[in-house]
């Protein structure tokens, strides 16, 4: 399972708001909603987020095995 908790920490660390992603970097509100809910996003969106925040995919998402997720 892919989780997006690193995104929120990266945004905080870099001082980037959801507002800035939506209005300055054209990331849709729907995309951020899907990420908050743990739903799938495209590689194009991952690329756009990395470009906007000058980071890597590891700064945006994390793989957690089903066993680890069940233990939490």
Annotate each language-model stretch with its function.
Residues 39-51, 69:
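Short, basic-rich loop-to-helix N-cap that marks the start of a DNA-contacting helix
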Residues 1-20:
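A short, Lys/Arg-rich alpha-helix, primarily the initiator
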Residues 12, 23, 51:
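Alpha-helical residues within the helix-turn-helix
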């Amino acid at each position: 399972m892919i989780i997006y908790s690193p995104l929120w920490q990266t945004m905080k660390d870099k001082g980037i708001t959801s507002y800035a992603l939506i209005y300055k970097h054209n990331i849709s509100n729907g995309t951020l909603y899907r990420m908050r809910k743990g739903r799938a996003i495209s590689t194009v969106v991952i690329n756009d987020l990395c470009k906007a925040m000058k980071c890597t995919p590891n700064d945006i998402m994390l793989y957690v095995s089903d066993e680890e997720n069940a233990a939490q």
